[in-house]
Amino acid sequence: MKKVLLATSALTLSAGFASADVSMSGTGGAGVFGAAGADLSVYSGVDLGFALSGASDNGMTFSASLDMGGGQTLDTGDFELDTQDMGTDDNVSVAIGVSGLTITLSQNGVDDLYDDDIAGDIGISGAMGDLTYSVVTGLEDADPTSLSIGYSAGAISGSVATSDEGDASTVTVTYAMGDITVSAESDTDRTGADTSSVTLTYAMADGMSVSLENSEDVNTVSVAYSSGAISVAVEADDATAETWEATMAYDLGGGATFNLGTNEAETTFAGVGFSF
């Protein structure tokens, strides 16, 4: 999972009919990592992103993005290391905005709207009032087609995403009541398996939040606390094969963070990550 934090230095270009901004951003880090009880080993890596955006004199907007990196970077959310390609990615993404529509072109580089396990070549997205919509497809018969619709008004929001690859779909509804948020989800995956879940989250004023999820009779409790530079999170469930994880992050300033984590599978990491 690549997580690139946007924005930093920018260079403004102009060429008669249009102006464009070119920016570079990135993440990276180094530390130690051990999966499933294995000995700790050193990791290091960097993931860089380059983006160009601008507008023509007739109001058409455009953007293009390019990603490159090397080594391995830490994914604290999934307790894993992500391998970064040496050199640039195969696909460059180009997006064009016309009359409220955004059209994205990237060969096998536009994520399917149900999940990002597969991809298409063409993405179209837009909004009508409180509704947002997106379509991802391709020109070849074998290319998947997916559709998503979202709605948000006041305290309530909802979304539907579907893909013809395996007839997968997911429906989510969320309602916020002050410090309490309730969400429900129904999902049919690409193999036809159905799951549903209900999640209740309470955000306290002192930097602590508590979340309880029930999914197919499995309860998951998550507690997160943040104070100043430090953030701590713990999650556990009561599944037949119980799982738990604990993470800590300390903001070192200047875009650097120290991360520490462990889980029931005896996967452990400690390292410094940075963004710019």
Q: What residues fall within each predicted segment?
A:
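Outer-membrane beta-barrel proteins
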Residues: 1-276
